Every structure is written in C-alpha cells, then in structure tokens.
Amino acid sequence: MCGIVGYIGFENAADFMLEGLEKLEYHGYDSAGIAVVGENNVIKVQKKMGRLANLEAVVKADPNQGHIGIGHTRWATHGRPSDMNAHPHTSTDGKFAVVHNGIIENYMPLKEELLAKGVEFTSETDTEVVAHLLSDMYDGNFESTVRRMLERIEGSYSLVMVCADEPNKIIATKKDNPLVVGLGKGENFIASDIPAIIQRTRETYIINDNEVVIVTPDSVTITDRAGQPVQKDIYHVTWNAEAAEKGGYEHFMLKEIYEQPKAIRDTLSGRINKDATEVVYDELNWTPDMVKGIKRILITACGTAYHAGLVAKYYIEQLARIPVEVDIASEYRYRTPLTDEDTLCIVISQSGETSDTLSALKEAKRLGAKSLGITNVVGSAVSREADQVIYTWAGPEIAVASTKAYTTQLVALLLLAVYLGQLNGRIDEAVKHEILTNLQELPALTHEIFENVDEIKAFANHYGYKEDAFFLGRLIDYAVAMEGSLKLKEISYIHAEAYAGGELKHGTLALIEEGIPVIALATQESVREKMMSNIKEVKARDAIVIGVGMKGDEELAKYVDHTIFVPKTDAFTVPILAVVPLQLLSYYAAITRGADVDKPRNLAKSVTVE
C-alpha cells in the first residue's frame, strides 16, 4: 500500500502519474515510483525513497516519455523503505511491470518456487513475486496470463499491470482493496482513490472484488475472473476538486478542524424533523419490530473510529437501553466471538476501506449478524459489504490525523442512538427533544470554540516541549480523553496516555510528578464529585492541570491551573464539542515541536492491510 495511479491515452503518462500521486500523498508513504512503456515498447522504471519530490527530481533529470504507465506511493509492509523496495516492480525479462496495494499472503512459497527455477529477485517485497509469476506463466497473451496468475496468489490486493508486448493495454484487478477507473475521451485513468483522478474526470467505475479490468485509450472492459462480462453503472463524482486544497490554511489538519461546523451541518442535514422531535434516517427504514429484535450491538473499528465507537456505547446504552460491546477490529475476528442473528454489528471507517474493519464485518455477517456501516466514502468497500450504511458527510479528509471524520461519526452515532430509542420506545421524549435541539445548534457552538484558539495555542506553545502528558476522564469523557491522547501522540510525538479517573490509584499515580501536564475532562455532571477528587489527586503531586469543561463551571476553574471551556450543552452532545480543543491543542503542540502535521512519521491515512 498506499496509492496507485495508471494512465493510458495521448498525453505523456509520467505527467499525469506524478500529478495523481501528489493527490494521494494524504495516505502517507515512504517511497514513490512510476513505470512507463516508452520507445520500442521498453518499460522504463523510476523510483525513489522519501517524498514525491525526490521522484520528481529524478524524472525531471531523465524524462520518462510514453503514453501508458503505472505509478505508486508505498507504505512498507514487506521490506524496509528503500529505492529497491519501492514500486513498480518488474520481471527479470522486463516484459511486465506491477504496482500493488495489499499483501500477497502466500508470497514466500511462490518466491521459493521461482528461486528454484533460477529467477533472481531484486527486492524484499511480496509484490515482486507477481511480476515474476507473470513472466514465468506468460503464454503470449497478457490477459489470459493475468487470469491464470490470479489463481496462484492469495491475500488482499489491488493490482495494476502493464506488458511490453501489449503496449496499448493496462490490466487491473482487486480483492479487499480499493480500485477505481476514470473515463476520459481518448484516454482513461486508474487509481486506488478518486482524488487522484478528479481533476481529469468525474465519470468513474468503482471496481468490485474479483473483477478484472482491461483498459485501453478508447475502452474499458470489465469481467469476472472467468472472463464473463460485468455490467456496471457509471458513478458520477460530485466532489468539488478544490476540496482537496488547503484553502489558505497552513496544513490540511487545521483546515479540516475549521471545516467541522460545516461537516456537522451536512451530516445533520435532513436527519432531524422540523420540530426536533424525531430522527429521520430514511436510508435505514427500520421498523420497531426489527429494532426490538436486536438483543445486542457490536461496534467494531480501529484507531479514531474505535474511539467514536466507545462514545457510541454510552449513547446507545443510555438512550436505547441496548447492551453494546466495542471491539478493536483487529482483535474481534480472532477470538471466536459470541455473535448471532440477534446481534447488530456496526462498523465505523472513515475511508470505508480499513482492512481489519472489513474483515470483522465479514466475520460478523458470517455468524449471522445484521450489519450497518458508518463511513465517509460513497461506494467504499464498507458501504458495499454492510447490509445498510450511514454516510458521514465530512467531505475529503486529507490529513492523516482524523478530525472532522471523527466529529461527524459522533453526530451520526448520536442520531443513531436516538433513532434506536425512538423505535424501541425506550428513550425519554424530553431528553430526545433536548438532544435534537442541541444538535441543530452544534455547528454554531463549534464555531464558538475557535474564538478561544489563541488561548489554546498559548498552552501548546508553553507545554509543547514536554515529553509526556496524561488525559483523564470518566464515562463519555474517558472515551474523548482517549481520542485526545491519540491526537497528541500521533502528530506531536509526545508520549501521551489516557486513563479513567477511577484508575489513578491503581498504578497511574506513580507516573505523576512535578510539572507533568494532565488534561482533565470534566463535562459529565453525574460524576462531577469523583472527577474533582481525581483532579485534586494529581494536583497534590504537582501536576500542571488543564481542565476542559463547560462554560460557567467556576468550580473546575478553582482546582486547575488552566481552563478550556466549551459552550454549555447536554451530556450527550458535549463530547462532540470537547474534542475540538483537544484537536487544536495537539495541532499547535506539533507545530511548536516542528513536526510534519499532515504526514506524521510511520503512519498511513487509510490502513488497507491487516
């Protein structure tokens, strides 16, 4: 993984591929490369470790001319980041070039088989096996060779391939990894993600698992593995191409933090009736009997989406009174879970392509569970695999660290909890009306937080040099603390941990010492007294406490060194507000430390391998 592009047409392929790869930089990567079928049908490969600019310099110094090519940005899974491990990979005879997202799980026995035949490998990757297999199995027909090669490999993949003997054709296929074909006039495009091609075309085919695509300048043919034609509707992309630009902000992350009021408004749009008395989820169309038949809810996700799931557990159990279990997706499928037909499995994924989450979804469905996907990407794997889907209308999120996707996930999940409660009759009508009214005000309330950004920036500048930080909270605040901790560590590289306030005495207090920053969330009235005791405990050890509470909380201000107040609202809506200053605090701490905010080290935006 991470990003794939391909071009065939009348332009110089290298120009498009460098442009497209730049649009995929948000995924995170450690190297980049291109392969172009040029003069005399020779495949010329150029690849370089590091930023895309390194590859661009190589291409500028040694132009790569031709009208058909494939490109890739890599995030290492097999083999260290290096020039030789970068994609594309070629066969020894130079006939084939391949780019690949995913993992070839049986690459080692295949490699041993090829080594025994005298094939020489030049990289440590699993992908190179595919190039050599194509060469070893070549029967003079590119397409039939690809189909037979696919019978040999196991795992997850998006594969895009060219053959020097058939220089007017690109062949691509996928399994459990995203792939899209863009349609032009006298030219066509291939990419792992729509942003790579949106400036060239809005007419696309979203490729499904086990489909094989044959692309020429004037045609796109889609078949199944056996070669039978597949009929597919054209998907028209409605995104604004400018949505992927920074819009005057220094970083995508800051831009996306400030886009949250609009993203929240868009996610709420049409989902609350005029009187704020009902949630309207037309895309679900569930019945009271169906919801009453749900005995248990399983939420599974990874990273930030997992933290959204933890908040949702409180939402659903309190408002709909249905038991909820939250699982890390990578753990769920390996523990023989107790999932059955009375279970509703909710999977959360910004991209809709997260490999572990997709695997968990498939396992839950295999065990008989009903399934619901919550994702930000129309046509994504989650949206296709789940029985039903709720979209968060956050728009493209470019920065690796998720911000607006998280807050819109919380909005969608709070609406879902209310929706479940109104269908099974377990939600209090007054509570429902209060929540829905406050949700309608949420975009404006989020804007208010930005009025205090200078104060947050000052805290970050003052404490950004610290190497450790702790986050505390109780109930929903604990789940938000976990997200705040993740944001701080992933972009500023400050070691940060989140703890439930009641766990302090069970070990954490041993780590509290003079001058260590503690961010204490105190928005939940039901545990106020306990949380104040926890704050006093860390203050007694000379910690520097930044309290996060709602406006007018004079008691909190007495016990902490600094306060960050968010607008006053109800206990269910406030987590969506409380996370915003934590995002800003993390952002400015990273700036203070000179970190690469949009592309933190060792991380990828969309994790499409297990």
Q: Where are the language model's segments positioned?
A:
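Conserved short alpha-helical segments that host acidic/polar catalytic motifs at enzyme active sites
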Residues: 1-250, 262-295, 334, 429, ...
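Hydrophobic alpha-helical scaffolding
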Residues: 7-10, 100, 120, 135-139, ...
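Generic C-terminus detector
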Residues: 253, 544, 557-559, 569-610
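Active-site phosphate/pyrophosphate-binding segments
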Residues: 260-264, 268-298, 388-517, 590-610
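Glycine-rich phosphate-binding loops that contact phosphosugars or nucleotide phosphates
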Residues: 292-441, 521-565, 585, 593
